[in-house]
Amino acid sequence: MKQPVRVAVTGAAGQIGYSLLFRIASGEMLGKDQPVILQLLEVPVEKAQQALKGVMMELDDCAFPLLAGMIGTDDPKVAFKDADYALLVGSRPRGPGMERADLLKVNGEIFIGQGQALNEVASRDVKVLVVGNPANTNAYIAMKSAPDLPAKNFTAMLRLDHNRALTQVAQKAGVVVADIEKLTVWGNHSPTMYADYRFATANGESLKDKINDPAWNKDVFLPTVGKRGAAIIEARGLSSAASAANAAIDHMRDWALGTNGKWVTMGVPSDGSYGIPEGVMFGFPVTTENGEYKIVQGLEIDEFSRERINFTLNELEEERAAIADMVK
C-alpha cells in the first residue's frame, strides 16, 4: 500500500462536498491503491461546524479501507497543512440584489486568505482545483496570493462544462459519450464559455461532419451548455451539486493519473497559447502525464471560434479588472 496523501477540501459540509468526499475516500479520485487523509475546512459558524461533524461521522461509518485519517477545522492553515491536493469548493453564492462585482470582491477576500494559507503550509507540489464560483477568477486570486508556489499548481474547473458538452454532442450525433475524443471548452466557467467540437471524433469519424448543423451549434448547443446550471436550479430548486462533484473527481483524477493522450478541459494559467494573455486563468484543451498538464497546440481557430474565444476572454479580463486592487 502506498503512503497516504493529504487531500484538503473546503466547503466540506456543503452540497458539493457531501457528493464529493465519499468518492474521494473510496478511491475514485486517486486510485484504489492510494490511501488518503481528508483535511476538511468549513466556515467558523456553529451550524456549519456541526454539519461537518455529521459528515465526518458518516465517513467513519463507511469504514473506507483507503481513509487513513480525517480532520475537521475552521482554520485554513490547519486544513492546508502539507496538503498534496486541495479542492477549493466553498465560496460565497450570489445573494438577492448582489451585483457580480460585489460577488467577485466577497469571494476575492476568501481566496486571498486561502491562497496565503496554501502558500504558507501546503506541500510545494500541491495540486489546487478551484470549484467555487466564479471559479476562474477565484483560482487566479488564489494563485496570485501564493507567490512561493508554482502558478501551474492552480487550476479552475471547466470539466463540468466539458462533461455537459460531451453529452449534448453525443445525443445529437447518436453516439455514446465513451467514444468521443478531442472535444474541448475554451474560456471562463460561465455562460460565455465556448464548447468546441470542431476537432472531436467518435470512433475516428468527425462529429462536426456527422452533425453538420451550424445553426444547432450556435442557437441550441452553446446556449444549452452555457445555461445548464440555471436550468438545473429551475428544475431541482437547488444547484447542480452531484454533477459538479463528479467533474471535480474527473479533473483531479486525470491530472494525477494521466489521460493517456486523450484531451480534457482544464482551466489553467495561460502561457500565451492561442493569443490568450499570459497568466489569465482560461479553459484550454490539455493532455496530462506524470502529474503535469500540457496545452494542446496547433489547433486552427476559425473566425466564429475567435469571436467566441474573445467574448469569454473579455469577461475574464473584466473580472480581473474588478479585483485588480485586491491582488498584486
Swiss-Prot record:
Annotated substrate binding sites: R94, R100, N133, R164
InterPro entries on file: L-lactate/malate_DH, Lactate/malate_DH_C, Lactate/malate_DH_N, Lactate_DH/Glyco_Ohase_4_C, Malate_DH_type2, NAD(P)-bd_dom_sf
Its EC number(s): 1.1.1.37
One GO MF term attached to the UniProt entry: L-malate dehydrogenase (NAD+) activity
GO terms (BP aspect): malate metabolic process; tricarboxylic acid cycle
Active site per UniProt: H189 (proton acceptor)
Keyword Iron: no
PANTHER family, sorted: MALATE DEHYDROGENASE
Protein name, per record: Malate dehydrogenase
Organism: Acinetobacter baumannii (strain SDF)
Gene that produces this protein: mdh
